[in-house]
Amino acid sequence: MAFLQQISGLGALERSCPSIMIGSSFRSGNGRVFDGRGIAYLGSREKFGFNRRRRVVLRVVAMSSSSTPFKMNLNEYMVTLEKPLGIRFALSADGKIFVHAIKKGSNAEKARIIMVGDTLKKASDSSGGTLVEIKDFGDTKKMLVEKTGSFSLVLERPFSPFPIQYLLHLSDLDLLYNRGRVSFVTWNKNLLSSNLRASSQGSGNSGYAAFSSKFFTPQGWKLLNRQSNSFQSGTKKNILSPPISPLVSVFSEDVPGDGEWGYGNFPLEEYIKALDRSKGELSYNHALGMRYSKITEQIYVGSCIQTEEDVENLSEAGITAILNFQGGTEAQNWGIDSQSINDACQKSEVLMINYPIKDADSFDLRKKLPLCVGLLLRLLKKNHRVFVTCTTGFDRSSACVIAYLHWMTDTSLHAAYSFVTGLHACKPDRPAIAWATWDLIAMVDDGKHDGTPTHSVTFVWNGHEGEEVLLVGDFTGNWKEPIKATHKGGPRFETEVRLTQGKYYYKYIINGDWRHSATSPTERDDRGNTNNIIVVGDVANVRPTIQQPRKDANIIKVIERVLTESERFRLAKAARCIAFSVCPIRLCPKS
């Protein structure tokens, strides 16, 4: 167990620094290794501090996760408080018990660590020794019965900020969820909360009838929801679930007198106004679980698979193959057990293919996108229903689907982009798709593109103010038609030239002297002259070499335009050449 200690009265929080072991592989559901690395925390050191001026000592401990060795859940923490706690708990329809509000001036507020939305995981028993797992409403009520003494609570902080603004507008009517409206009869006592179970075991079968849904365990919730068909799964296609699950009940300690309850030591109204201003921006909330959308009958796109139950839900939806672009380190960072998910895929007979792409890396996406589309085409040709996923579902997975529609179905990039973004909330890297498109066409054209320009290049010269700067090169009428650079202020001069795919030599003429730039790559020509060189675009390959380009002061931007009929034909040919370079049996590039 790794510890994080905070002593009341000290000015700083002492943090442990765990070691990191790198090297675990990231495997596909059928046992094939594609790429990716994993991390495991090996250990940490604890530090203690004391303040003799204060009687109350607050101890905060970061708890290790479950029984898995050498790992810890940094979202979990333990805090010891005196009674009364001053915490109002809420039970949500998904079976979670979380902090609903904190009383002003209470011990919980003085701790300055507990936040609204933190899930209650464990609590110490009446003797104050053993930590007991909180599974249901009954376990929490047992803890709240005690009037005095100190209690240790283990809480878990959500990955994403809890939507406190929705709690502010809830009324008493919102807490009448299913209260007395649905009866539940069972012979299985394990479906009821702990405070309703008999202490002695009977010889016969006893029946139970419940009219308030707050007395269920998570297992009972799941059974009730399936029978009543009222449960809207977090993976429901094209439907955004509410930010928080409906509340079943709200409860706290029985303390005489009234007190003011709050949601934190910050101006909530200003926070809500800031959230309103940010509406329309995409943000990933891992706590909402896996989200997906149906694009076609055979293609689904969405966020990452988090649990084995997600695999079961996908299998029930008819998914037979998963194309995953999330890396092993990403999965570790989000607390996802990749091995258990791969095992669940094998159990459900769902093919899992892992091909990691770096998140928010336009260059890595551009280089790997052709093979991604090739893998997707191979899966579709084998009559698979494919779920394309990454971490958020906003970028890499949706970019793959858009590129597939653009390259394989002769749909324009604009139409494919609008179609996918209209069905699934996402914002893929559109320039990366356009850049990969020209790389594919260049593959058929032997690295060159004869036709309308494909890229816009801004040539940059850093010299002295007052200089006359001219640009000359392969693209200026065979070095005979110099282009005058524009002074942008200070030592910076710029010239924008629209070029086709290819490799170009160039130089600058500064006040009549021919010179090359020291801030851009250089190369000697056949005559021994040192020239600057720029490579516009690249050639797609089924085995991409992910080598970052050399540092260059010049700026290259891709041009997105409507393809000519000849370009569309060459694009379709190149994309299928990549796809046919993928082995249909092993689903990896042919040797």
UniProtKB/Swiss-Prot annotation:
The active site is at 390 (phosphocysteine intermediate). One of its GO terms (molecular function) is phosphoprotein phosphatase activity. Its EC number is 3.1.3.-. Disruption phenotype: Slight reduction in rosette size and fresh weight and increased starch content in leaves. One of its GO terms (biological process) is starch catabolic process. It is found in: Plastid, Chloroplast. It comes from the Eukaryota. Residues 291-453 form the Tyrosine-protein phosphatase domain. Residues 1-61 form a transit peptide. This is Phosphoglucan phosphatase LSF1, chloroplastic. It comes from Arabidopsis thaliana. The lineage of its organism: Eukaryota, Viridiplantae, Streptophyta, Embryophyta, Tracheophyta. The gene is LSF1.
